[in-house]
Amino acid sequence: MWTLQQPDLYAYAVHDGAKRTKIAAFDLDGTLISSKTRSKFPKNPDDWQLLPCAHKLKRLYELGYDLVVFTNQAHLGSGKIKASDLLYKLENIKKATGVPISFYVSPNKDEHRKPDTGMWREMAKQFTHIDKEQSFYVGDAAGRINLTTGQKDFSDSDRVFAKNLSLQFYTPEQFIQLDLDL
């Protein structure tokens, strides 16, 4: 069930914090999903498709990880998209992954917005203990520069978010290459 945990934080939490201590955390757009129409921003709540990172979620859950998505959604805060449309989209993403997954959504520029750690702090209240040594965060906003094309990531907020939390950080490309059964 969706809750408005703070005036500026939406959460759908399905944590089993009493039993699970490892967190596999992900950014949403550009990490777990992309627009089917290849536009920068989705055209409607059904304009998304799972990316390769999402196909590893079931194995992570089997390995005892609690699965969490932390996403900045400025278009929600600005009114460009409706909360009901975003929540509909996230419900469908959850169904498509086939595993219990929690979502934390920051619509505004405040202490919850990545790279600040407010969303993580709210999530952590659901756990008796989090093993940060075995937890990690995957995101596409890594501040990378493509030396061939000169193109840059739009931000480094995902990398800085992980650093602020002392979590191992992976880009989606790095995460896809990981052998989860080692």
UniProtKB/Swiss-Prot annotation:
Entry's Gene Ontology molecular function annotations: ATP-dependent polydeoxyribonucleotide 5'-hydroxyl-kinase activity; double-stranded DNA binding; polynucleotide 3'-phosphatase activity
InterPro entries, per database record: HAD-like_sf, HAD-SF_hydro_IIIA, HAD_sf, PNK3P, Polynucleotide_phosphatase
Protein name: Uncharacterized 20.8 kDa protein in FGF-VUBI intergenic region
Family indicated by similarity: Belongs to the DNA 3' phosphatase family.
Source organism phylogeny: Viruses, Viruses incertae sedis, Naldaviricetes, Lefavirales, Baculoviridae
GO terms of biological process kind: DNA repair
